[in-house]
Amino acid sequence: MNMLDQLFTKARSIGAKIMFNPGNLELDHQRKLLGLLSDVNVLIVNKNEAKKIVQGTMLSEIVARIKNYVPAAIVTDGNQGAIASDGQETYRIGLYEDVIIKASTGAGDAFGSGFLAAYSDGRSFKESLIFASANSTSVVQKIGSKAGIINKNVKLHNMPIQEIR
């Protein structure tokens, strides 16, 4: 955790933005993790991981509580999609397309990496969520955690994203 703290401090000092997907080591030390979150711009976790950070049962409630620690949060919930907040708006996003799931290995990582790729490429938060969902949807149609990863230039269609009040 000390190494992460140093890394985050250095990143902030050079103006870098931080998207963080904590692992079990960080999640098992809630107090230290909460201290690190002040440096994080976007936190992405799955529902079970989020429950190790804050209390709550409903996904929208969990995201609302996480927003007390970070400017933007994304909490994924398997084939139920995700709830995400950019600090201004909160969105519920489902699966990009209704597909036959061959394997779910790598789906969460594909969502996170898809979001990061699109967001760091200058796309809006909402557009990045669509790219993330498309990437994850593509990955679950293949066997293996890397098969199906989409190219940043892939043509995407719109998908419904519900704004939550």
What residue spans do the PLM features occupy?
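Ribokinase/PfkB-type carbohydrate-kinase core domain
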Residues: 1-91, 160-165
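Conserved post-catalytic alpha-helical subdomain immediately downstream of the catalytic base
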Residues: 72-75, 79, 96-163
